[in-house]
A protein has these predicted regions:
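An acidic/histidine-cluster motif and surrounding catalytic segment
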Residues: 1-95, 99-138
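Single conserved hydrophobic/aromatic residue that forms the stacking wall/gate
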Residues: 136-153
């Protein structure tokens, strides 16, 4: 039993990106979901930019500063977003198959705490742990000039 699983209660549907040729990574992701009592997840078959013909997705040439693997990664994330947009869900959590929920054990907050600090009209909220020794619990404030919130005049 995972005593920290409660911290992920309220997590939106997960779209997990996984290459068809990496079934062991999908199995590991499914095991992680089970350990964390996450049930609402979907596998998204990733594009492999090194092998797949992406000409029906990418028009023109790849950006000069991106290799084919990076293009495959970006297009896979776009594919996951398209899958999500077919639903009526208000938001989604898009991850790759190497995502690790283990640092959640050390959170002094829950997923619901995170969501309560995000502006109601957010479009994208990116989660990342770059340095697991430092966890910031407050999102950066939105640039007020770009906010869609009505002014109180």
């Amino acid at each position: 039993m995972n005593k920290a699983a409660y911290k992920l209660k309220g997590l939106p549907p997960i779209y997990c990106i996984n290459l068809d040729g990496e079934p062991h990574r999908w199995e590991a992701a499914e095991n992680m979901f089970k350990e964390w009592e996450v049930e609402n997840y979907t596998r998204v078959s990733a594009y492999d930019g090194r092998e797949d013909d992406l000409s029906d997705i990418i028009k023109g040439k790849y950006p000069d500063n991106m290799n084919s693997g990076e293009v495959g990664c970006v297009t896979s994330h776009l594919k996951a977003m398209k899958e999500f947009l077919k639903t009526d869900e208000p938001y989604a959590f898009i991850i790759e198959d190497d995502c690790d929920f283990d640092p959640v054990r050390y959170w002094s907050f829950t997923w619901r705490d995170i969501m309560s600090k995000i502006p109601y009209d957010f479009d994208v909220f990116q989660t990342a742990i770059i340095n697991p020794c430092l966890l910031y619990t407050s999102p950066s404030p939105r640039d007020k000039s770009s906010s869609r919130m009505p002014s109180s005049a």
